[in-house]
């Protein structure tokens, strides 16, 4: 799927910011931007899969959001999940299943 250059630039910034804070297994874009139906109220929905060895995903999410706030131009909804949890939940009726099936893997 081809995204607008402004959105692609934002995704590049998001990906680089995440990679500066952790070593993600993968990063997914999901929601309205992934579905090709964003509107003026849409945020950028991002799900980051991190290694199981990542100790504190809540603190990591706060740190990444802080770093993203320095330059982002659109609102971002950032979720972080450990790899084993993502792998386990992507086969059930969960958000992870929607992300795995309908999201766009932008890294990993």
Where are these regions (language model features)?
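Short beta-strand->loop micro-motif that forms the acidic, two-metal-ion catalytic signature
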Residues: 45-49
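Catalytic core of pol beta-like nucleotidyltransferases
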Residues: 1-26, 35-40, 51-108
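Glycine-rich beta-strand-to-loop/alpha-helix junction loops that act as flexible
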Residues: 30-32
């Amino acid at each position: 799927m081809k995204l607008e250059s402004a959105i692609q630039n934002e995704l590049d910034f998001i990906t680089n910011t995440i990679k500066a804070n952790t070593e993600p297994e993968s990063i997914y874009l999901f929601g309205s931007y992934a579905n090709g139906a964003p509107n003026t109220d849409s945020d950028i929905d991002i799900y980051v899969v991190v290694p199981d060895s990542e100790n504190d995903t809540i603190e990591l999410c706060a740190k990444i959001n802080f770093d993203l706030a320095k330059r982002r131009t659109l609102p971002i909804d950032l979720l972080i999940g450990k790899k084993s949890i993502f792998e386990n939940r992507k086969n059930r009726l969960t958000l992870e299943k929607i992300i795995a099936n309908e999201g766009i893997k932008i890294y990993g």
